[in-house]
Design a protein with these regions (language model features):
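Charged, alpha-helix-forming regions
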Residues: 2-137
Length: 137
């Protein structure tokens, strides 16, 4: 995983053993744009790649749906604020604020999963409609 803002940060694949655990959010402190992604699988990370690792006591049921939701929330929060000159360094990462749905003072992961599942279904429907438009021609 590199600091690119493309392809979920994936630069390539290796047969070497992964040195970073998956189920984390990665971001870069060296480029502009919004290179914030959820990484499901263990990976090898390049220099300047930062990882946000969920705390088990705060988000015990952190998974891909919750991770992608939080990554998008971070991406929206930092959009347009950082570039090659103004870096998204550790201090700026720690000061970044995002809004998450809460219930009883905790992040409402059930609600997040519901929203993300509905969005996946909607997106899949759009892709199917698009593909069907070709078969009807």
């Amino acid at each position: 995983i590199t600091n690119t803002a493309l392809n979920n940060g994936v630069k390539g694949y290796s047969r070497l053993e992964a040195c970073n655990k998956g189920n984390v959010i990665t971001l870069s402190d060296t480029i502009g744009g919004s290179p914030v992604f959820y990484q499901e699988k263990d990976f090898i990370g390049f220099a300047h790649l930062k990882m946000l690792i969920p705390k088990k006591n705060t988000l015990p049921d952190f998974d891909g749906l919750v991770g992608r939701y939080i990554a998008v929330s971070i991406r929206k929060s930092i959009s347009g604020r950082y570039n090659y000159t103004t870096k998204l360094n550790t201090g700026n990462i720690l000061r970044t604020k995002i809004s998450l749905p809460c219930k009883d003072g905790l992040v409402d992961t059930d609600f997040i999963r519901k929203i993300m599942t509905e969005e996946q279904k909607r997106s899949a429907g759009l892709v199917l409609d698009y593909l069907r438009s070709f078969s009807e021609q």
